[in-house]
Regions:
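Rossmann-like adenosine-cofactor binding region
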Residues: 62-155, 171
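Structural/interface elements that position substrates and couple domains in central-metabolism enzymes
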Residues: 4, 57-59, 64-66
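Phosphate-coordination loops involved in phosphoryl transfer and adenosine-cofactor binding
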Residues: 28-31, 53, 104, 113
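Short, structured coil segments at secondary-structure junctions
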Residues: 52, 71, 158-160
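Glycine-rich Rossmann-fold phosphate-binding loop(s) that bind the pyrophosphate
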Residues: 37-38
Length: 212
């Protein structure tokens, strides 16, 4: 939303004594591509329902067609997401399959005014390729919360239309408290031979076994 409405640019200009107003786009009028439809990706789909009826394209290595009963989504391959989406948001784990999944080839397939978001894991988007593509003027914005190496001091800091945050996705007191409670409760269930609630599906675990 910040990138769609140039909020970060307006904020900087206001602090510099400038009064400029920017045309943006409404979320309900664009196409959103979601790569990775696990718990978080599904949550993104759910949250988007409050913004009208954007077209939602989704892709996952293990499609969950049951979601079609609750949401108006379209399952497509990744290439179609890169080519059609106005916003591409990544919600996959970092695996051998997703390492450098988004390279220059994929970025240049995106619309010139598209936006890409990565709040999943560093290393999924090739940072050097993203820098070079954005430096050339392609893409209207990027929002990156995770990096190959953290703390991040790389070249993307030079790109003003690239919003960078310091891996802050779970950085709220209530979220961290909930994480600690859930981890403790799951450990207790394991140690007392009770059914577990956070089991990784075997098919996903098989992918993780392949390593990076």
């Amino acid at each position: 939303l910040t990138l769609l409405r140039s909020v970060q640019v307006s904020n900087m200009e206001m602090h510099n004594g400038k009064w400029n107003r920017f045309f943006g786009r409404r979320l309900s009028e664009i196409t959103i591509g979601i790569i990775g439809v696990g718990r978080i990706g599904t949550g993104v789909i759910r949250n988007l329902q409050g913004f009208g009826s954007p077209k939602i394209l989704v892709n996952d290595i293990l499609p969950k067609y049951s979601l079609d009963q609750d949401f108006n989504i379209e399952w497509v391959d990744q290439d179609e997401i890169y080519q059609q989406a106005d916003i591409v948001t990544i919600h996959t784990p970092l695996t051998a399959q997703t390492k450098n999944m988004v390279k220059k080839e994929q970025l240049l397939c995106m619309k010139e005014d598209a936006i890409i978001i990565n709040t999943a894991r560093g290393g999924i988007i090739n940072e050097q390729d993203l820098y070079e593509v954005m430096q050339s003027g392609h893409l209207s914005g990027a929002a990156i919360d995770v990096f190959d190496f953290e703390p991040y001091y790389g070249k993307l800091r030079e790109i003003k239309r690239c919003i960078l945050t310091a891996h802050m996705g779970s950085m709220s007191v209530d979220c961290r408290t909930r994480m600690e409670i859930e981890a403790t409760e799951e450990a207790v269930r394991f140690l007392t031979n009770q059914p577990l609630e956070g089991v990784v599906p075997e098919e996903e675990y098989a992918v993780q076994r392949e390593g990076l």
